[in-house]
Each structure stands twice: as C-alpha cells, then as structure tokens.
Amino acid sequence: MFAGYRKLDNLVVIVDLNGLQIDGAISEICDPEPLDKKFEAFRFHTITIDGNDFEQIAKAFEEARATKGMPTAIIAKTVKGKGVSFMENAVNWHGVAPNDEQFEIAMQELEKAGEALCQK
C-alpha cells in the first residue's frame, strides 16, 4: 500500500506464479487469483508475462522502467522445474536437491534447452 501511495515508480516486484507450493496446487490451497487486480488495488501497474520467456521478461522490465508515478508488479507465470523432464510441475521437488545422477540428467537437459534458445 505504501509503495503505491508514495508513487514509488523505481520499485519492481516480481511474482513467480508457478501454481504450486510445497503441499500442492495453490488453486486448491490458497488461490491468489486474480493477483493482478490485487496489485492494482494497491496502485501498482501490473504486467503478466510468460516467466519462462526471456524476451517477455526483458520487455516487462522496459515497460516497468517507462512507467511513471506508480510501482510495477511483474506477474511471471512459470513452469516449476522448466526444462528438466522429471522436475517440471512436480510438487515433490520443492526444496529437494537432486542426487548426483539426477543432477547430471538435469544439466544435460538444460544444456540442450540452452542451445535451442541460442539458435533463435
């Protein structure tokens, strides 16, 4: 409330909205939606993006920098564990470290995903 009231246009809040928390889907436990409307009620400019898309992230920060007279909330809709087949959207990976074998597999999958991004 303070940030919006004071028009803190140099403040950017980023919310990682992956739809999961430690014990399940947030929609079944404590659904925060509509999150954008809640921030707007506190005088925030809101931007909702695909948080797994680097171009959208960069554009959101450009828009936030250009926004005057109010703070910005970037709501980044993401996929938990994106790019690692056995971790994607898996609640059981919250706060758990992979073993050595899982780590190697994850790194290989992420390297392939990174190479694909560089080809764009």
Show the residue positions of the predicted features.
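Glycine-rich ThDP/TPP pyrophosphate-binding loop and its adjacent helix/strand module
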Residues: M1-K120
